[in-house]
């Protein structure tokens, strides 16, 4: 036990922990102190004490496993279908990229950020102790096309009454609303900063707004399509990395408009293709569907006797979508036509000006904790004028395999290295919420690999 403890201390890299070696020696050898003070060393303990002892041991053991080895993650949304399905429970390896030490070690066991049965309003962690980002040695690094679990970067600020929507999305929509109201009323338009301040104050008055540290932000799972130093480009729905078209996986989905002769497609056909009931969306006219389909399923449906046409639902180049990163009309991008955009790499320096500052605002101001201001088109970092910036962390570009039903980097930008949690390796349980009885359990997905 002592050797294992020393090896663990070397791995963690905090040699002050060697002061705990006498405790380990006493627990296993000398046994002078009753470290499990809640139970008697000799004689029979009450059954309640025995259960309490087992519970304490289980909580400590599972907590250590979650930090250093594996963590469970349940897929809540269809953003990775058909690679990973809603209801899949994943074993996420912490050693794949190296375990990340907690920022907030004082937390109620087995919770992410909220106490159970409180309606999402009571936080489960304390900020009395806050540790800086530290990642232990792992077996490798994040690679292109790895499936990765990470903390949601835009989840640093949350409106408790609207937790399913990003605070920054709420803020942008509020700015658009009050700007439109001024235009309709014929009032003089305000500056960008003034609209921001007004919208922010309205939101803080209307909602309960809180801050969450990195390790207490919601967990997401996506595919890492771009690593530090890569250039991402999307043209007509096709993804290019460094000028080369990226691999299209068999399980990757795109939304299609499927036209029929007025009759509906047999539900059994949808069931065979794995198209869930919630995805079977009829068009307004009722003469077709809008469906997320793999390329293979699209080819299958196109051969149905009552299908008269099928077309991928791609946006036009130049169609500006305000929700798409960097949320700047100067870059008329959308989820199907995006970039080129370079992914920041640790130690690299970029020139800053008013044409590109929106790409790096969150990095400089939030992720790397500087004070960023813009006054009269002059950029100030920590109170000093700045025309360049050197990145202190690596960044990644994450996208869902279900391209038209995924909130991912196309909408909120880069994922910092300190947000990376681990890599899913196995599906250990899969529950289909739309099925009944034993059919709810997808036995065919048990222990299915989830690496690629």
Task: Name what the model sees in each region.
Residues 1-452:
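Extended hydrophobic leader/signal-anchor segments used for secretion and membrane insertion
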């Amino acid at each position: 036990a002592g050797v294992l403890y020393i090896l663990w201390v070397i791995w963690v890299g905090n040699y002050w922990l060697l002061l705990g070696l006498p405790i380990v020696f006493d627990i296993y050898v000398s046994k002078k102190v009753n470290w499990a003070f809640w139970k008697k060393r000799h004689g029979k303990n009450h059954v309640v004490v025995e259960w309490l002892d087992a519970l304490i041991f289980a909580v400590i053991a599972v907590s250590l496993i979650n930090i250093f080895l594996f963590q469970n993650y349940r897929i809540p949304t269809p953003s990775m279908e058909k690679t990973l399905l809603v209801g899949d429970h994943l074993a996420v390896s912490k050693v794949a990229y190296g375990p990340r030490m907690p920022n907030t070690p004082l937390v109620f066991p087995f919770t992410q950020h909220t106490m159970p049965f409180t309606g999402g309003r009571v936080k489960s962690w304390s900020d009395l102790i806050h540790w800086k980002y530290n990642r232990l040695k792992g077996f490798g690094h994040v690679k292109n096309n790895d499936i990765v679990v990470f903390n949601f970067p835009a989840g640093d600020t949350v409106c408790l009454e609207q937790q399913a929507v990003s605070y920054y999305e709420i803020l942008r929509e509020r700015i658009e609303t009050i700007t439109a109201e001024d235009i309709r009323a014929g009032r003089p338009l305000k500056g960008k900063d003034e609209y921001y301040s007004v919208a922010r104050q309205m939101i803080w008055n209307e909602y309960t707004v809180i801050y969450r540290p990195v390790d207490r932000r919601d967990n997401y799972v996506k595919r890492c399509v771009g690593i530090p130093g890569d250039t991402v480009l999307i043209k007509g729905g096709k993804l290019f990395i460094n000028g080369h078209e990226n691999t299209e996986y068999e399980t990757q989905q795109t939304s299609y408009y499927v036209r029929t002769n007025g009759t509906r497609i047999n539900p059994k056909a949808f069931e065979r293709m794995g198209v869930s009931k919630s995805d079977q969306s009829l068009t307004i006219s009722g003469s077709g569907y809008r469906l997320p389909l793999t390329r293979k399923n699209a080819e299958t449906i196109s051969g149905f006797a009552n299908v008269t046409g099928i077309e991928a639902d791609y946006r036009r180049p130049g169609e500006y979508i305000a929700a798409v990163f960097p949320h700047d009309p100067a870059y008329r991008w959308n989820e199907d036509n995006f970039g080129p955009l370079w992914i920041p790499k640790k130690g690299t320096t970029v020139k800053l000006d008013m044409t590109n500052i929106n790409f790096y605002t969150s990095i400089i101001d939030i992720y790397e904790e500087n004070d960023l201001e813009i006054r009269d088109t002059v950029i100030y970092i920590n109170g000093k004028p700045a025309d360049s910036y050197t990145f202190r962390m690596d960044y990644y570009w994450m996208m869902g395999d279900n391209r038209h039903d995924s909130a991912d980097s196309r909408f909120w930008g880069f994922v910092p290295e300190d947000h990376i949690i681990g890599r899913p390796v196995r599906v250990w349980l899969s529950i289909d919420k739309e099925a009944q009885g034993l059919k709810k359990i997808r036995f065919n997905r048990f222990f299915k690999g989830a690496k690629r």
